[in-house]
Swiss-Prot record:
The name this protein goes by in its record: Squalene synthase BSS
Pfam family name, one: SQS_PSY
GO cellular component: endoplasmic reticulum membrane
Organism of this sequence: Botryococcus braunii
Subcellular localization, as worded in the UniProt entry: Endoplasmic reticulum membrane
Parts of the chain that traverse the membrane: 430-450
Matching Gene3D superfamilies: Farnesyl Diphosphate Synthase (1.10.600.10)
Keyword annotations of the record: Endoplasmic reticulum, Magnesium, Membrane, Metal-binding, NAD, NADP, Transferase, Transmembrane, Transmembrane helix
Alphabetical list of PROSITE patterns matching this protein: SQUALEN_PHYTOEN_SYN_1, SQUALEN_PHYTOEN_SYN_2
GO molecular function, one term: squalene synthase [NAD(P)H] activity
InterPro entries given in the database record: Isoprenoid_synthase_dom_sf, Squ/phyt_synthse, Squal_synth-like, Squalene/phytoene_synthase_CS, Trans_IPPS_euk-type, Trans_IPPS_HH
Catalytic reactions on record: 2 (2E,6E)-farnesyl diphosphate + NADPH + H(+) = squalene + 2 diphosphate + NADP(+); 2 (2E,6E)-farnesyl diphosphate + NADH + H(+) = squalene + 2 diphosphate + NAD(+)
Length: 461
């Protein structure tokens, strides 16, 4: 049924066909499979706990793959501990605070999590530790520091519970995602592929994390509120308290109107980070690092657009509020330069603006929503005016390669057919035949396999 649905969607959206095929290729053949057992486990479990991040991590420059892979797995393990509502607070809080010490302890392992892959990650955690200890001292220092800061922040909020104010909400998101942006910036600089100026823009790194985290928190309402043995609640009381006495009330269809107003205000709050994300991405110098940063941000804006004024958030399941596979693939393979990023953000902002004016014109937060969208549009239009679109150049090169390979294959068969089997020595005939097929296959590879975009000049914020 899934393949049939994808086939129908491809016919309806033919511009998504090639990106989907490229994504399938990356998923099947782009996975890193180290011979070393411990590294092999790390990349295997990475592909299981996060397919989307796994793809972009494995497309990073070689010197960054292991550090970022381990960084992700360490924080995923920490997040699994925080999310496990079966762990008593008296046990969880010290574990969160001390987790940064566990990442260098070869004997540490534990049972936690509600999904088999997360359980397996923590059960076989010594393999992650083994690879962590092979990283450079600077990389280990960065990962340990961010883990410590995140763990302490998570522990603080075990005590605090539901964030009261938007400031509390921002602080929580800083601890669980903003510091990740800071750590990644430090790893980029430590690799030598990014100038140190990036680490001086900590506020922008923080906005990158907050934009992603808030999108996830909004989308995951239904899953979090129904968590057992106790719900997880991250929406700030300052927002939902305007519309309900309890966050769980939004599940009741009788409260749909209030739920939608609350949801739209939550989306509005997340939108204020988008302009800063564009500023951060304009500072990235290495094209592969750019892809790594840009793709999740584009997906987040797309998902946020789906969440806006969408009551499915409160009725579930989470999969109901998800970008189509074709849309995901198209965004993934067209978010490879600043021109494309400005274009995607502008497109999302313009579509949301139309919905604000038609669907939610009476919404209590719509004026603020439109203000944020106008800022995003202005930043994108200014960015488009000063950057070059090289998308067509890449497409033209790919089409030229595919056309040339096809022409050569056709010419070869026509040539051999005209000559006849006895006019050429068998060796030359066979060589010509297989050489033409090889060139044709290479042309197909050039057309489908993801390329490395050319570096962009750094833009002023």
């Amino acid at each position: 049924m899934g393949m049939l649905r994808w086939g129908v969607e491809s016919l309806q959206n033919p511009d998504e066909l090639i990106p989907v095929l490229r994504m399938i290729y990356a998923d099947k053949f782009g996975k890193i499979k180290p011979k070393d057992e411990d590294r092999g486990f790390c990349y295997e479990i990475l592909n299981l706990v996060s397919r989307s991040f796994a793809i972009v991590i494995q497309q990073l420059p070689a010197q960054l793959r292991d550090p970022v892979c381990i960084f992700y797995l360490v924080l995923r393990a920490l997040d699994t501990v925080e999310d496990d509502m079966k762990i008593a607070a008296t046990t969880k809080i010290p574990l969160l605070r001390d987790f940064y010490e566990k990442i260098s302890d070869r004997s540490f392992r534990m049972t936690a999590g509600d999904q088999k892959d997360y359980i397996r990650l923590l059960d076989q955690y010594p393999k992650v530790t083994s690879v962590f200890l092979k990283l450079t001292p600077r990389e280990q220092e960065i990962i340990a520091d961010i883990t410590k800061r995140m763990g302490n922040g998570m522990a603080d909020f075990v005590h605090k519970g539901v964030p009261d104010t938007v400031g509390d909400y921002d602080l929580y998101c800083h601890y669980v995602a903003g510091v990740v942006g800071l750590g990644l910036s430090q790893l980029f600089v430590a690799s030598g592929l990014q100038s140190p100026s990036l680490t001086r823009s900590e506020d922008l790194s923080n906005h990158m994390g907050l934009f992603l985290q808030k999108t996830n928190i909004i989308r995951d309402y239904f899953e979090d509120i129904n968590e057992l043995p106790a719900p997880r609640m991250f929406w700030p009381r300052e927002i939902w308290g305007k519309y309900a006495n309890n966050l769980a009330e939004f599940k009741d269809p009788a409260n749909k109107a209030a739920a939608m107003c609350c949801l739209n205000e939550m989306v509005t709050d997340a939108l204020r980070h988008a302009v800063y994300c564009l500023q951060y991405m304009s500072m990235i110098e290495d094209p592969q690092i750019f892809n790594f940063c840009a793709i999740p941000q584009t997906m987040a804006f797309g998902t946020l657009s789906l969440c806006y004024n969408n009551y499915t958030i409160f009725t579930g399941p989470k999969a109901a509020v998800k970008l189509r596979r074709g849309t995901t693939a198209k965004l993934m393979y067209t978010s490879n330069n600043m021109f494309a990023m400005y274009r995607h953000f502008l497109n999302f902002a313009e579509k949301l603006e139309v919905r604000c004016n038609t669907e939610t014109s009476e919404d209590p937060s719509v004026t603020t929503t439109l203000e944020h969208l106008h800022k995003i549009k202005a930043a994108c239009k200014a960015g488009l005016a000063r950057t070059k679109d090289d998308t067509f150049d890449e497409l033209r090169s790919r089409l030229l390669a595919l056309t040339g390979g096809s022409f050569y294959l056709a010419w070869t068969y026509n040539f051999l057919d005209l000559r006849g089997p006895g006019d050429l020595p068998t060796f030359l005939s066979v060589t010509q035949h297989w050489w033409s097929i090889l060139i044709f296959l290479i042309s197909i590879a050039v057309f489908f396999i993801p390329s490395r975009p050319s570096p962009r000049p750094t833009l002023s914020a």
